[in-house]
Every structure is written in C-alpha cells, then in structure tokens.
Amino acid sequence: GKFTKVDIGATLDAAMATSGEKVYGVKCSSCHKTTDEKLVGPGWKGVTTRRTPEWIMNFITNTDEMINKDPAAQAQLEICLVRMPNQSLSDDDARHLLEFMRKNDGVK
C-alpha cells in the first residue's frame, strides 16, 4: 500500500480518536466489535499490537489490494470467510480510525 511511514504520537490524540469513533459507528460497527469477539469481521481489541500502523492504514484504504497481496490479510479472510468491502474512506478517516483503535487498546 501507499502508507510506508505513519507518525503516531506516544500519547493519544483525543480529538482524532473521537472523530475515528464516529467513523467506526457509521462505517465499521455493523461488522466489527471493539472487543476481541468476532462479529462478521474480527474484533478490534489488540489490533494495534498485532499490526503496524502502516498495515492498518493500508488495509482500511486499500482493502482489495491488501487481501490480494498480503499473507496476513489472506489468513484473516480464511478465518472470517467474508471479504471486507471497500468502504471508500479517506486517508484522514483511516488515520482517525487508527487513533480510535489505539484508544480502544488503552493508549492514553
């Protein structure tokens, strides 16, 4: 994907996380829970420790290419059996979602 370096702070950007939570509510919550429980797609708890910020941003913004080319994404598809549809999210939306994921994983 196009993201090779994503700058994240040591502490949480609260405004960005709040914006990301709104995006989650509209675009993501029908398939993803913020716990480790699978809904349609995998739960988000711990995702920021399992995946790099770059992987997360590339997956959110370029889902099809990641599923086609990335072994970790392909393995996830085999577990969930449902291909994540492209949500047409902007780079900003994706970055805000990443910050919400970080908040969900306990970053203060």
Predicted regions and their residues:
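C-terminal capping alpha-helices of c-type cytochrome domains
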Residues: 54-58, 82-108
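Axial heme c-ligation environment in periplasmic c-type cytochrome domains
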Residues: 39-47, 64-94
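Short pre-active-site segment immediately N-terminal to redox-active cysteine/selenocysteine motifs
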Residues: 16, 24-27, 35, 83, ...
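Sec-exported extracytoplasmic/periplasmic mature domains
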Residues: 25, 29, 33-36, 49, ...
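Electrostatic cytochrome c docking/interface patches
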Residues: 1-23
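Sequence context of c-type cytochrome heme-c attachment sites
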Residues: 7, 33, 74-76
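Gly/Gly-Pro-rich "capping" loops immediately C-terminal to redox-active cysteine motifs
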Residues: 17, 21, 33-62
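Short coil/turn linker and secondary-structure boundary residues
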Residues: 12-15, 51, 89-92
